């Protein structure tokens, strides 16, 4: 599936669709380059480009990005399991080897608080400005907790500024991050929703994109638009699709989002 060399990860393109993985709404710290993408996470970065039938990930943090891209997971097995559902087949065929990332927990919490009622270009810009305050590195809970709310306002966080500050302080002053890693999915979601600015959708995104709980199905406006049956409420839709797709519901959500919101909408 992949092999590593000094400062390089070589992945078969059949095991990693870079565009689908980066542009499906789960990650905000990436930029297109002339020959591929640059991705940043925490204090780490990598450059990604195609080489024949392979994807090359150049980085000084090889082990970090093997884990970040979840390269030990057989994504094509997941796709085969979901292909028994006829309504998913077009999306599955269109998204290639989209992978659910394994992102740092605190960074994911803050990024998705910023994402609420926002669009991707603006989210990316705010997060880039936030990281720019710390040398282009995502801040630790302690660093972010020390930032005055007015400075968060100044970089465009708006009404989310107080939520970000308060959540950073909780993460800095308690052991909630360790508890989240150890908790079951339901308990993790309850803990997440105790943080200021974290509702059900943000909690679902964090448990899926950081904690790796693939059974979670975040419901956004695109899911309501394309997956809703009759007068279903968001909780009813979420419960139905999670029961239907089981342990792969989160993967189904990502391919449906990428297919409907990105591919068919452009």
Name every feature range the model reports, one short phrase each.
Residues 1-266:
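HhH-family (HhH-GPD) DNA N-glycosylase catalytic core used in base-excision repair
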């Amino acid at each position: 599936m992949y092999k590593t060399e000094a400062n390089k990860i070589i992945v078969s393109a059949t095991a990693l669709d870079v565009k689908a993985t980066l542009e499906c709404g789960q990650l905000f710290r990436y930029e297109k380059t002339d020959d591929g993408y640059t991705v940043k996470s925490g204090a780490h970065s990598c450059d990604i480009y195609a080489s024949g039938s392979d994807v090359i990930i150049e980085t000084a943090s090889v082990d970090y990005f093997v884990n970040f891209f979840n390269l030990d997971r057989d994504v094509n097995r997941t796709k085969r399991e979901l292909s028994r559902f006829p309504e998913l087949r077009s999306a599955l065929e269109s998204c290639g080897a989209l992978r659910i990332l394994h992102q740092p927990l605190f960074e994911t919490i803050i990024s998705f608080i910023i994402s609420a009622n926002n669009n991707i270009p603006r989210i990316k810009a705010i997060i880039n400005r936030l990281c720019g305050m710390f040398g282009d590195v995502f801040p630790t809970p302690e660093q972010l907790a020390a930032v005055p709310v007015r400075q968060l306002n100044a970089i465009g966080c708006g009404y989310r500024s107080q939520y970000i500050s308060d959540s950073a302080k909780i993460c800095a002053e308690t052991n909630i991050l360790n508890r989240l890693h150890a908790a079951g999915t339901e308990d993790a979601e309850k803990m997440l929703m105790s943080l200021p600015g974290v509702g059900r959708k943000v909690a679902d995104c964090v448990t899926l994109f950081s904690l790796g709980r693939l059974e979670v199905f975040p419901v956004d406006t695109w899911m309501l638009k394309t997956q809703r049956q009759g007068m279903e409420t968001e909780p009813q839709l979420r419960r139905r699709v999670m029961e239907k797709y089981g342990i792969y519901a989160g993967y189904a959500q990502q391919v449906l989002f990428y297919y409907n919101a990105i591919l068919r909408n452009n």
